[in-house]
């Protein structure tokens, strides 16, 4: 123990009371936890006891209920205590459920049958309505849509009725003559007097028959209003005047006034005398009575004989009877001589007989004529409308074309005005500055050159690091920067082809070089310092590039073919450019500068010395002819085109070479031979300074003109 106490740490004297407090607090906490646990256990025990008591109470209640039921209904329970009533009730419910399902099925069937019956009834109703509708349509067609019947048909029917009646009664036809009002005879007057006497004697006997005749006349009038009449028959009836009947020996039971009344009614209405046609339905007895009454008073159909002959005239004799209808017996009468009638012209129309066939043909012809007339009118209207439409379209098109033409001319004039204003501004600037600003490179070209130079430097670093991803990214960026290189070349060619620039170049004695330095860098060694060191072998740089880039033999063959094509095309272009340059300078020497026509023959290069007295200024000479000016403009335009083609050839060779190479090989190629990266901007400043000094110097003649001319003509 002593050894153990030696290892215990000795607490400091000042902190002993803190340790005691900690121990006391821990003891209190333990006591509290124990008390809480005991309380929880007691609560759980109490809950369990309560649950047990509740279960016991429920069991007791159930037992009491069963005992009460057994006391009330002892028959329902067996000896074993099974409830028989509950079993029976369950069976009853099951049976009721089965019956209920059957009833449901029967009700559903009844509903279906009712639905089918209703549908059948609806179909029957629909059929009935359709049948009724069809019947009504047929009735309407029968009543109102009958075919058109000519009036001549009714006349033929009436004549048939009269002929049948005459044949049945054996009445012979009576010949009567038409007499004019101007030519009257004594015999006719005698017969008329006899008839009048007979009529006066028989007036009293025939009063009873007047009522029947009036009724018949009313029926005839009603029927005549319904039927259509023929105009020719009416005219024939109007012409009948003074009908004479020889009835001296006849007992007249029939009233002669009836005939006159009937004729007067027919003539007053301008209608023929026909039997009545009653369309209205009547009784059979009434119809028979009317027929009997009408048969008594019907007038037979008469034939008109205009020829005056002595043939005997047969007149009917009527036997009077009271109870029966009159019977007609023919009697012979002695003929009376009648004076011949001289025909006199009357304004009455000529009688014309028409048949149903002729009327139908005439109607068809009229219908066809009306159709043709209507069609011609429609065609004329349509042609007129089409002509108007075409005229309107033509006028609209003409106006639209006129507007478009005027608009095109206005656009062209506006463009010409813009170009003229631009040229005037350029001329004013050139007069002030002397085309110094024109020879300076544009800001876009300077920016493109600086961007290409930075990209080539980055490519060089990525090649040293062997970073392929950065190489691909930089190559894409390089091609994006040089997208507008063709437009820059065209802009620079326009600057060179300017007449002011060519004038200054001819003063200086500039001649274009045989090869462009950018194109030479493709196959020759590159000199960063720009010194005049010449390389004996043209393929020195090209061979080193093949070794560094590990070019395959297929690639080398393709590159050789590209080189051959490039040299061939560039040589032909250079010759054309050189010829144009000589022609332009000869124009300036002949028409602008004051020198002899053949300077080489009269002057030697050593003897020619600059002297201001031998020359005259440009302003003292007149301008050349318009033809010569136009020739100069055409040559300058062709020079511009050739320069743009030469620059495009250079760029096309670079793009074709880059398409054959891999990204790493292309990067090596651009680092070695980039036309934009190896340009020194200080050279541009030097050229501008020299150019400004030449322009600002007073001009009286070209400097060392003889030497420049010798160079120019020796090249040719």
Curated annotation (Swiss-Prot):
Q: Where is this region: Leucine-zipper?
A: 406-413
UniProt subcellular location: Nucleus
Give an example GO biological process: regulation of gene expression
Major location category of this protein: nucleus
From the UniProt entry, list the residue stretches annotated as the region Disordered: 173-233
Q: Which GO terms describe its molecular function?
A: DNA-binding transcription factor activity; sequence-specific DNA binding
Query: Gene3D superfamilies from the entry?
Result: 1.20.5.170
Superkingdom is Eukaryota
Q: Which InterPro entries match?
A: bZIP (IPR004827), bZIP_sf (IPR046347)
Can you tell me which residues the record assigns to a coiled coil?
20-142
Region listing for Basic motif, in residue ranges: 387-403
Domain bZIP, which positions? Answer: 381-444
Q: Name one GO cellular component term.
A: nucleus
Q: Does the keyword DNA-binding apply?
A: yes
Record's keyword terms, sorted: Coiled coil, DNA-binding, Nucleus, Transcription, Transcription regulation
Task of the protein? Probable transcriptional regulator.
Into which family does the record put it?
A: Belongs to the bZIP family.
Q: What is this protein called?
A: Probable basic-leucine zipper transcription factor O
Q: Which organism is it from?
A: Dictyostelium discoideum (Social amoeba)
Gene behind this protein: bzpO
């Amino acid at each position: 123990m002593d050894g153990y106490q030696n290892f215990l740490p000795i607490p400091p004297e000042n902190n002993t009371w803190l340790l005691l407090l900690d121990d006391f607090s821990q003891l209190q906490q333990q006591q509290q936890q124990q008390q809480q646990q005991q309380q929880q256990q007691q609560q759980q025990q109490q809950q369990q006891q309560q649950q047990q008591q509740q279960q016991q109470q429920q069991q007791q209640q159930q037992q009491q209920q069963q005992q009460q039921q057994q006391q009330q209904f002892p028959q329902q329970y067996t000896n074993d205590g099974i409830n028989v009533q509950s079993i029976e009730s369950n069976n009853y419910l099951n049976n009721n459920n089965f019956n209920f399902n059957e009833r449901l099925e029967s009700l559903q069937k009844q509903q279906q049958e009712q639905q089918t019956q209703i549908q059948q009834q609806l179909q029957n109703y629909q059929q009935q309505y359709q049948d009724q509708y069809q019947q009504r349509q047929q009735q309407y067609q029968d009543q109102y849509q009958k075919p058109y019947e000519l009036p001549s048909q009714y006349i033929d029917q009436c004549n048939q009725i009269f002929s049948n009646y005459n044949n049945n009664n054996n009445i012979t036809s009576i010949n009567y003559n038409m007499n004019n009002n101007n030519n009257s005879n004594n015999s006719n007057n005698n017969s008329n007097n006899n008839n009048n006497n007979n009529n006066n004697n028989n007036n009293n006997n025939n009063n009873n028959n007047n009522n029947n005749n009036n009724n018949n006349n009313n029926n005839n009038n009603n029927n005549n209003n319904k039927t259509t009449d023929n105009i020719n028959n009416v005219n024939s009836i109007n012409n009948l005047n003074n009908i004479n009947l020889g009835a001296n020996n006849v007992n007249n039971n029939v009233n002669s006034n009836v005939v006159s009344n009937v004729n007067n009614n027919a003539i007053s209405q301008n209608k023929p005398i026909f039997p009545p046609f009653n369309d209205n339905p009547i009784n059979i007895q009434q119809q028979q009575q009317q027929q009997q009454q009408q048969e008594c008073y019907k007038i037979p159909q008469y034939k008109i004989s205009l020829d005056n002959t002595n043939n005997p005239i047969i007149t009917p004799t009527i036997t009077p009877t009271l109870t029966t209808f009159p019977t007609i017996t023919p009697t012979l009468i002695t003929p009376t001589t009648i004076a011949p009638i001289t025909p006199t012209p009357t304004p009455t129309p000529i009688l014309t007989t028409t048949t149903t066939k002729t009327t139908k043909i005439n109607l068809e012809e009229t219908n066809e004529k009306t159709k043709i007339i209507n069609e011609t009118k429609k065609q004329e209207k349509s042609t007129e409308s089409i002509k108007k439409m075409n005229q309107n379209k033509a006028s609209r098109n003409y106006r639209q074309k006129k507007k478009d033409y005027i608009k095109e001319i206005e656009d062209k004039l506006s463009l010409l005005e813009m170009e003229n204003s631009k040229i005037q501004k350029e001329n004013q600037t050139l007069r002030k500055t002397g085309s110094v600003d024109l020879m300076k490179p544009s800001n876009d070209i300077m920016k493109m050159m600086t961007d290409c130079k930075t990209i080539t430097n980055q490519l060089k670093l990525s090649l040293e690091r062997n970073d392929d991803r950065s190489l691909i990214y930089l190559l894409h960026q390089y091609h994006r920067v040089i997208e507008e290189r063709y437009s820059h070349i065209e802009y620079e060619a326009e600057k060179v082809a300017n007449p002011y620039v060519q004038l200054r170049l001819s003063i200086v004695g500039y001649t274009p070089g045989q090869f462009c330095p950018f194109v030479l860098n493709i196959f020759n060694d590159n000199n960063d310092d720009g010194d005049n060191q010449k390389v004996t072998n043209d393929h020195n740089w090209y061979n080193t590039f093949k070794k560094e880039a590990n070019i395959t033999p297929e690639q080398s063959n393709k590159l050789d073919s590209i080189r051959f094509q490039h040299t061939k095309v560039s040589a032909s272009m250079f010759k054309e450019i050189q010829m144009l340059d000589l022609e332009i300078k000869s124009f300036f020497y002949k028409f602008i500068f004051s020198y002899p026509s053949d300077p080489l023959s009269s002057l030697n290069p050593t003897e020619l010395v600059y002297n201001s007295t031998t020359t005259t200024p440009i302003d003292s000479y007149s301008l050349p002819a318009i033809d010569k000016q136009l020739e100069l403009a055409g040559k300058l335009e062709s020079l511009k085109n050739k320069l743009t083609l030469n620059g495009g050839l250079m760029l096309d060779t670079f793009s074709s070479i880059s398409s054959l190479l891999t990204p790493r090989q292309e990067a090596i190629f651009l680092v070695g031979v980039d036309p934009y990266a190896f340009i020194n901007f200080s050279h541009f400043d030097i050229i501008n300074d020299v150019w400004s000094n030449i322009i600002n110097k007073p001009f009286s003649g070209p400097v060392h003109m003889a030497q420049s001319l010798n160079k120019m003509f020796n090249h040719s």
